């Protein structure tokens, strides 16, 4: 069984624009179009059995939209989607409970895109609360091709 554990998708209405921005920032050409349908096509071509989508909440206002989109994709056609939260969101425990209620297995954090250092106390509190609820926590580490060094 092959599982691609680090994928991203975007809502169809913003996927093309978002992919172009990421391509320009990274100086590379994307091999997929950023949509769920594009991911499924890529999975089939590559022989991938499951893909895990890791959305990134880059600002607190994206919380509802990203998690509702993640929940809609989760569990369909060999797709597992995590949720997302920003360390500057208010009511972190309630928001994490909502992610769990949506049936999402965990959250993805991205210190660079969220513009908060990983050793910031906000992350520690957020991670502790997530673990207490039984949510998995994925933290992006290393260099991101879409960000300047």
Feature locations, PLM:
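Glutamate identity and glutamate-enriched acidic tracts
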Residues: 13-16, 23, 115, 121, ...
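An N-terminally biased module of ancient metal coordination in phosphate/nucleic-acid-related enzymes
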Residues: 1-56, 61
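Active-site gating/metal-coordination segments in enzymes
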Residues: 49-50, 60-147
């Amino acid at each position: 069984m092959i599982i691609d554990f680090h994928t991203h998708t975007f809502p169809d209405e913003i996927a093309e624009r978002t992919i172009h921005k990421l391509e320009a920032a990274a100086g590379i050409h994307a091999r997929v179009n950023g949509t769920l349908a594009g991911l499924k096509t890529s999975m089939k071509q590559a022989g991938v059995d499951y893909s895990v989508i890791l959305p990134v909440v880059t600002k607190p206002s994206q919380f509802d939209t990203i998690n509702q989109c993640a929940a809609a994709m989760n569990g369909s056609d060999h797709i597992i989607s995590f949720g997302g939260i920003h360390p500057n969101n208010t009511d972190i425990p309630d928001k994490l409970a909502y992610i769990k209620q949506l049936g999402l297995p965990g959250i993805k954090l991205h210190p660079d895109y969220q513009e908060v250092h990983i050793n910031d106390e906000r992350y520690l509190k957020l991670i502790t609360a997530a673990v207490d609820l039984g949510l998995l926590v994925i933290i992006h580490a290393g260099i991101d091709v879409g960000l300047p060094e």
